[in-house]
Amino acid sequence: VVDAGVPLFCVDMVPTSDTLVWTQVGVDEAEFGRLQAEKLAEVLPENGTVCIAMNQLGTNSQINRTRGFEEKIAELRPDVTIIDEQPADSKTDKAMNLVEDWLQRFGADGINAIVCQSAMTVQGVVEALRAHDLLGKIYVAAQDFTQPSGTEWLETGATYVDVFYDYNALAKGVYDTILD
């Protein structure tokens, strides 16, 4: 890419190479985590507990969404404890397995909220909680879940908050950047 003089545009990712010249089109990933923390801070009980189902380790979204959540929840609710953080890798089945593991380790009463970093993770978390009749009993903070069931889940209490990711605006930003 460098030797050929081909421009590199990164959509929603930040390359780790120091030798590449690139343009990134994306969002403030930490803001996603901060928004989730702000909403959960309003409802978590005193000394509440949270598990985070993260995106793939080392990705811009995983690092910054996690950091944003951790910093904001510590600021707003220092009594809240993040009891576990594990990668779900944006996979529904992996998220379901995480919830099963957390329920075994901490019990249903030991988890007050689960923070999700992608739509597929949300789907797995909700399905696992549904299987244990825990929807609405453990808060779910969602991200990116724009599919029709996402709205239904907010309305029925399966999820408590969903931070919207405007993919149309992202696509327009990429298009405009390439044309510049």
Please place each PLM-identified region on the residue numbering.
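A residue-level marker of the well-folded mature domains of exported/periplasmic proteins
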Residues: 1-180
